A protein has these predicted regions:
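Conserved phosphate-binding catalytic cores of ATP/NTP-utilizing and phosphoryl-transfer enzymes
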Residues: 2-8, 116-140, 334
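A short helix-loop
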Residues: 2-9, 15-16, 23, 33-34, ...
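N-terminal beta-alpha supersecondary unit
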Residues: 6-79, 85-89, 118, 122
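Glycine-rich phosphate-binding loop and adjoining helix at the ATP-binding site
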Residues: 79-131
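Glycine-rich beta-strand-to-loop/alpha-helix junction loops that act as flexible
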Residues: 85-88, 105, 145, 289-298
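Conserved phosphate-binding/catalytic loops in two-lobed NTP-binding clefts
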Residues: 115-116, 288, 305-331
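Glycine-rich phosphate-binding/hydrolytic loop that grips phosphoryl groups
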Residues: 122-124, 319-357
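A contiguous, well-structured pocket-lining segment that forms one wall/lid of small-molecule binding clefts
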Residues: 194-289, 298-312, 342, 358
Length: 358
């Protein structure tokens, strides 16, 4: 007997930083429509995201992006089951645009509202990989992005235990700042990785800060300073007139990237081993690493994590590159909150910032 019931549909909205995105997602995970408006050209001349410019761009683009996703899915607001939006963490102005839009549509269409943690959604993107187990949890989770570098125990998709994070710069932020020192185009992380693939990763002996620290915190500011000293000496602030050979750029990028990846891999291995020791009765379940965030697209990181997984015998699931950067498809995590009846009120406020513990 077949059912004529209409499919359950979720509208997911993302505006935490400089991408305006929306997606229409069925309960089974099928993406019926999605749209992303990027802002790279708006921020390129500044070498980084300018919060006010980002917020204004979101304001201009949010409704066209939502309408495009709905049109692709061939649905209207009344067809939706729920509306989800990332309300934390991120840039205040950017978050506000998405949250206000979601609350307005939820009110207008009489749909339940679901608030999402942007970082938890990044990790959930691993669940969307073809071949991933139906339930990828529990696992150790690594978020590595421009604003955050954090480790978690992920008991379920929506129950995460924060283990530790960066005490200064995030890994992605360090990539962007090194790119700026070398006068590379924005966004810098991709450019650094490109040059790194052609360089000698042993040309410079950069520090691996906190790599031997038994805790789960990270630090990349010292590495950033070491790169500055290597290419310009102490005290220099203006790098625009500094002449650096192409080979030096390649070697600096390769040595820098190796230092970042070594720390990330080492911390993940240690966290997994500790988690396994705490859960010896369920060792197989505790023996899994999931990775999300923009820097998770880095090929050296993916390669070295896979090598560690093969050597240590743990499962590795990394979000596909197109879901590492900010997007609304990872908002499919909202279905887990829907099932748990974790709905937000129309008084929902934003929680911006880069605070530890998210």
């Amino acid at each position: 007997m077949t059912s004529d019931a209409a499919p359950e549909l979720l509208l997911s909205i993302e505006s935490t930083c400089d991408e305006t995105a929306a997606a229409v997602i069925r309960r089974d995970g099928t993406v019926l429509g999605q749209c992303i408006a990027t802002q790279e050209t708006l921020h390129e001349q500044f070498g980084g995201v300018v919060p006010e410019i980002a917020a204004r761009a979101h304001l201009e683009r949010i409704l066209p992006v939502i309408n495009t996703a709905l049109k692709q899915a061939d649905v209207c607001g009344e067809d939706l089951t729920a509306i989800a939006v990332a309300d934390r963490p991120g840039l205040a102005g950017s978050l506000l645009v998405g949250v206000v839009a979601a609350k307005t549509l939820a009110l207008a269409w009489s749909k339940p509202l679901i608030a999402l943690n942007h970082l938890h959604a990044h990790l959930y993107a691993c669940q969307l990989i073809d071949g991933a187990p139906e339930n990828i949890y529990p696992a150790i989770g690594l978020i590595v992005s421009g604003g955050h570098t954090s480790l978690y125990v992920c008991h379920t998709a929506i129950e995460l235990e924060y283990l530790g994070g960066t005490i200064d710069d995030a890994a992605g932020e360090a990539f962007d700042k090194v790119a700026a020192m070398l006068s590379l185009p924005f966004p810098g992380g991709v450019e650094v990785a490109k040059l790194a693939s052609e360089g000698n990763d042993k040309a410079y002996s950069f520090p691996r800060s906190m790599i031997h620290d038994p805790g789960d915190d990270f630090s990349f500011s010292g590495l950033k300073t070491a790169v500055r000293y290597a290419i310009a000496g102490p005290g220099r602030q203006d790098f625009s007139t500094l002449e650096i050979s192409d080979q030096v750029k390649r070697d600096v990028c390769a040595s820098f990237e190796a230092a970042v990846v070594d720390v990330l891999v080492s911390k993940c291995r240690r966290a997994i081993k500790r988690h396994k020791n705490r859960n010896k009765s369920n060792a197989n379940e505790a023996n899994r690493l999931i990775v999300g965030g923009g820097v998770a697209a880095n090929q050296r990181l993916r390669r070295d994590l896979q090598a560690a997984a093969d050597q240590d015998g743990f499962e590795l699931w990394i979000a596909p590159p197109h879901l590492c950067t900010d997007n609304a498809v990872m908002g499919a995590i909202a279905w887990k909150k829907f099932e748990a009846e974790q709905f937000a009120s129309l008084d929902l406020d934003i929680t911006p910032g880069l605070q530890r513990g998210f």
